[in-house]
Amino acid sequence: MPLNTTLNTEQPHPAHAQLDGYDTATLVAALAADQAEAAAAVQRAGPALAQAVEGAAARLREGGRLVYVGAGTSGRLGLLDSVELHPTFSWPPERALALLAGGERALYRAVEGAEDSREAGAADIAAAAVGASDVVLLLAASGGTPYTVAAAEAARAAGALTVGFANNPGAPLLAACEVAVLLDTGPEVISGSTRLKAGTAQKIALNTFSSAVMVKLHKVYGNLMVDVRASNAKLVQRALRLTMLASGADEAAAQAALAASHGSVKLAIVMLKAGVDAPTAQARLAAARGSIRGALG
């Protein structure tokens, strides 16, 4: 592959040419301050993210999946977002899939040459049976990773909504995707180390995207996380607290409703606020496509 000297993310940072000579306090301050630029880059990408959220919510309402694709740090960040959807929003695990160049072993160590294989990118999309109802999120700091670009092309050809996240303007990945999310973070404090603010920007963008999608899919009531899956003691207490906050019920009533709803915060809230039993609350929620507001009329 020819050396690419034009990518913003590969340029030496002009403010930190003497980084190795910094005292420890200055070094830490420089690294921390540069991370703040990641959040600003995501804010600038707001319109594209909003477009991605609207398009994704529409497909997911019809039963589609979220498919995350990337190599190295970008792939691991996609995997992280995918696995957090189930405990946070009770999103079905089978509807969140992460494809990482090099497969599962690339989670723990670099797999030589994996990101350079266009064939593997296209093959992984085919093996996942990606189709028109799916939303495919493709991440690459450079925006030119062959595995990820080929996956984008294959997913788009299959009719999926493709959303590309890259940290360099004019990146091939952005051109290959239906929705282009440019996270223009510029040079890194450590030249070319895109696990720093480029990766941070990708993480913030994924947090923003998936959280906004779940709000649109009625996984949040007010600003309360009402579709949380109470899978440990901490989350059991959170479910109780959320039920009390949303319904105004006391602890005993909230506990009784949660017991009757088998731990479903949404169901318990509708039961308490509407004064109905669990089957009736479930029917109301189903008719309202999971919306508590809709179920309460």
Predicted features and spans:
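Cofactor-/ligand-binding subdomain signature composed of acidic, glycine-rich
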Residues: 1-41
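Gly-rich Lys/Arg/Thr-decorated short loops/hinges at beta-loop-alpha junctions or inter-strand turns
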Residues: 30-38, 98-109, 221, 262
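Short, basic, glycine/proline-bearing loop/turn elements
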Residues: 34-44, 110, 135-138
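A short, well-structured juxtamembrane/interface segment
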Residues: 44-61
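Residues at the C-terminal ends
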Residues: 61-62, 157
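Glycine-rich phosphate-binding loops that contact phosphosugars or nucleotide phosphates
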Residues: 67-205, 213-217
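Short, amphipathic alpha-helical interaction segments embedded in low-complexity terminal/linker regions
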Residues: 208, 213-297
